[in-house]
Amino acid sequence: MTAKPLVRPGLAAYFIPVTRHDHHLHQGESLREAAKSRLTQRGEQWTDMRQAVFDALANFDKPASAYDIAEGVSKALGRRVAANSVYRILDLFVQSNLAMRVESANAYVANQHPGCLHDCIFLICDDCGQTTHIDDDSLSSGVREAAAKSGFSASRPVIEVRGKCGDCN
């Protein structure tokens, strides 16, 4: 399978489709509307602050920390926004599949296909920080099966592979 670049300009990530269903990748206003729809379907409100946090997150080229996002929201709103407020919103976004957390970097990326549920698999470049999100259900199901064989119930496998991207190689 070949990687197709995400459609949002400047995003240094690629998406590898899963064969069992189609993904609809969103960008710009479409991404915001898909996120809003997903959140409201879950019975949550799409507040101005949540929109500001989502917009700031979606504008980053690389995984962003809550502090980076708080700084972006503060500039956009013209007032200081605390990182702890952003963390709470990011937690909700992760639970709602609007964002994915890059555990090793304590950073987040917007999910460009919030209607699809997959375990997180990230390829992280040690040189430039480019983070590629891929969906490979065969890999993540293997992790879940191995965990189950050990009597462990995996709630959310996260796989992060560190190395060098094609640009830095």
Language model: regions and residue ranges:
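Non-DNA-binding regulatory cores of transcription-related proteins
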Residues: 94-169
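Short capping segments at the starts of secondary-structure elements
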Residues: 46-48, 59-65
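Short, positively charged and aromatic/hydrophobic N-terminal segments
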Residues: 9-10, 14-17
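DNA-recognition alpha helix
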Residues: 65-79
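Short amphipathic alpha-helical elements of helix-turn-helix/winged-helix folds
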Residues: 38, 55-60, 72
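Short alpha-helical segments that sit at the start of domains
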Residues: 21-54
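Basic amphipathic alpha-helical segments that dock to polyanions
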Residues: 86-96
